[in-house]
Every structure is written in C-alpha cells, then in structure tokens.
C-alpha cells in the first residue's frame, strides 16, 4: 500500500471549501413595528456558528480570499453586537442554556480571531473557556471544545488534559482528539486504541478509518 503522508492540523474530519454566506445585518439587528431597535439573539448565535464552521481551526476553510475578507468583516460586526449586549446588560437577562451559549459564542469569536492571526485572542478565549468550565464543570463538551482549540494552537499537553476530562464525562469524540495528540508525539501505538474507541461511536468517519487502518498496516507516516 502506498505510504500515506499525514499533516496534522487538528481538524476533525475534512471540510471541503464551500460557499460562505455573507452576514445579513438586518436578520440580527432590526426595528419592530413601533420603531424600536431589536436584536435577534438566536440569529446572532447562528451567525457565530456559521463563522465558527469555517474558522474554528487553522488553516481556514474559506473558498477564496474574497470570502475570507467578507467573513472577517462579518466577524467584526458580530463581535460589536456581542459587546453592545454585554455593555447594556442584555446578556445577563439570558438565563440557562441561552446564557451559557452566549458565553460559548464569545469564546468562539476569540478562537476565530486567533485563527485570523489577531494577536492576544488566544488568552481571551482561554479566559472565557475557563469561566465556562467553572460554571458547568460537568459539561464534557466544553472541555472537548477547549481541547480542540488548545490542540490547534499547539498546546498539546493542555489539550490532552482537557480531552481526558471530556472523555471521563462521556464525550466519545474526545477519543479522536487524544489519538491526534498521540500522533503529534509520534506515538502511533498509543493512538490506535483511541481511534478504535472513537470508531465504535462514529463508524462512518472515513478520516478516522484511514488513520486506524494505516496504523495497523504500518503505512502511516506522520509529519507534524
């Protein structure tokens, strides 16, 4: 079998470059029938999610430079809305899952800005993820998402710690993160059990299948 050359970017699955849909300002900020300004926070969350899909990890997944520029412009607009909501105390009126997701979106905006090479954003993301973990220490998904960012920003030891915590809290996808951490350390033997466990829950993940089969066949070459 032909040798497989793997460049580890710590992206989970392979996202083919596709058309980024530019932000529609009016869908988030609008006026009601009485002329009062309103913010649709659900639309705001969705806009953040859309940006995060394309820029959650490096390299960015935009189709071309034009889309990348449009997305960065949208990012700054979305960030301003979040800052306004925070400054006016609107964010505090959101309780439960909505309030938690507001903070998750704030952390993701800093992750995105970091991946756009904006200085100082990693520390800001770290701070908010730390706050989220303190608020919801039993939420394994927060640990896993934070670990994804730590891995993508080349902080392997911290990433491993958070993947372990996520896995202990039942987040099965953390096995893939742990496998990639092992591969980053050139430990194929240590990566394989995590890949096999991951595939028990995500049997259709072709990326993980290729990695596992290549390790078993001794044909995987890893270059960090």
PLM features: residue spans?
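Classical Sec-dependent N-terminal signal peptides that target proteins to the secretory pathway
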Residues: 1-18
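Terminal, low-structured helical/coil segments at or just beyond the last alpha-helical repeat
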Residues: 35-42, 190-224
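Amphipathic alpha-helical repeat scaffolds of TPR domains
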Residues: 37-65, 94-114, 141
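Short coil/turn linking the two alpha-helices of tandem helical-hairpin repeats
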Residues: 55-66, 107, 111-119, 153-154, ...
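Flexible helix-coil transition and linker loops at the boundaries of alpha-helical arrays
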Residues: 81-100, 131-136
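Alpha-helical adaptor scaffolds
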Residues: 99-177, 181-184
